[in-house]
């Protein structure tokens, strides 16, 4: 008997207000960590109409022109015209930046790297599955690809009436746990006022949706909802206030896996909200790539100032090829999840973070996304006593 379900995930473009804020936060981090790998950064941004407010706690020997970094980021996204209501050249940039609390410093700094204490308490999740060639859930993967395609066509001038703000939403039909068809695809994009709804709908379906979605998933039952309100001229920070860290499900697994609640952007890797989540993805992906399970969710937790995780747990949703207790043992044998060792193994003290602030932190194939490597898949497979796995990444 076929068991049919639907699952939906969404993504947002680089011009979405919350993503503008994320990119500013990570651009500041990149500027500092490139000069001072041991900097401590917790940088937040708020964007609205003609203003950007950058605040947080930063302790570093480096210097960064936060105002200019902010302006450059806004301009690179595409807010470069006063007629859009938000322009990187003319917007106000206000900063309120202090130093990291000395109470936190004493638990995090001044230790050997391998004993670096976690920058805060918290729990993080990592997930991987065989739904796609990047070991990610299919709905979030294609939602990201749709808004990336929107940005590409906007920037290369093929659809010159596109504007930076956009959202996508993909609902897939699953049969016995596998995606088989697209039930509904939503694409809302900001646009210039002169384009008609009819022309916009046709172009979005033909130029954005169909080139990205697998053709065998699109059938007569697939619903296309393009700018469902009929008009999306006012957008970006004019239409909505943007805030760093408000798109944590977009940043991760699109709701297919659990989330510990901590955001990533603007945080240096001593913050386990970021490095712990990256490490958990690394572990989960290698477990699936190694053939130990078809789906895997890892939870890891930390206490502030303590290097060793307070817990590590594994869930394979009935797809495990070996017992979950054994998988947990293999994790402890082959992965060092102390923050200092995570930072070292994944080479996180680099200016790599602005690229993560759009289109998801996971399932990416760029080389700087070191937590996407599957270099331990074969080691895990052999340790588990399994036949060769099909490792595609």
UniProtKB/Swiss-Prot annotation:
Pathway where this protein functions: Amino-acid biosynthesis; S-adenosyl-L-methionine biosynthesis; S-adenosyl-L-methionine from L-methionine: step 1/1
Free-text comment on the cofactor: Binds 2 divalent ions per subunit. Binds 1 potassium ion per subunit.
Gene3D superfamilies in the cross-refs: 3.30.300.10
Cofactor or coenzyme needed: Mg(2+); K(+)
Locations listed in the record: Cytoplasm
UniProt catalytic activity: L-methionine + ATP + H2O = S-adenosyl-L-methionine + phosphate + diphosphate
GO biological process: one example: S-adenosylmethionine biosynthetic process
Top EC class of this enzyme: transferase
The entry's keywords: ATP-binding, Cytoplasm, Magnesium, Metal-binding, Nucleotide-binding, One-carbon metabolism, Potassium, Transferase
Enzyme Commission identifier(s): 2.5.1.6
Record HAMAP family: S_AdoMet_synth1 (MF_00086)
PANTHER family: S-ADENOSYLMETHIONINE SYNTHETASE
Family to which the UniProt record says this protein belongs: Belongs to the AdoMet synthase family.
Subunit-structure text: Homotetramer; dimer of dimers.
The protein, known as: S-adenosylmethionine synthase
The species this protein was found in: Coxiella burnetii (strain RSA 493 / Nine Mile phase I)
